[in-house]
Amino acid sequence: MADSFLKKMEKLEAAEDFFKLLEIPYDIKVLRVYRLHILQRFHDYISAGSRDVGTQTEEQLKQYYGSLLEKAYRDFVHSTAQEEKVFKVFKEQQPASPRTEVRFVSLDSLIGGSKLKSKTL
């Protein structure tokens, strides 16, 4: 029973396919923007779990994986990829440094105003 469900999950490719199989409602606008982030977070939640899927029924697995996918999806409903830091590029990103004052230095002050006079031919 559970093996056939797991095989179905292994064959899924698109994020929408996971949501349909697990019967999780979603906003297509959120999914379009964060599909890779949601699927990676879903994978992270599965990896962090310690459930023995071999002893579960298909319905139990559907509920279990559905709850993890829904949790991953909700992470991005009211948040951003930068805040959630799913991928390495965001995890390693340094916080913005405070702005420093930029001073203007005129060319005249560097080379002297008298040297800038143009010559007419």
From Swiss-Prot:
Q: Which InterPro entries match?
A: NifW
What keyword terms does UniProt attach to this protein?
Nitrogen fixation
What is one GO biological process annotated to this record?
A: nitrogen fixation
One family from Pfam that matches here is NifW
Keyword Magnesium tagged: no
Q: How does it assemble?
A: Homotrimer; associates with NifD.
Known function:
May protect the nitrogenase Fe-Mo protein from oxidative damage.
Protein family (similarity comment): Belongs to the NifW family.
Record-given protein name? Nitrogenase-stabilizing/protective protein NifW
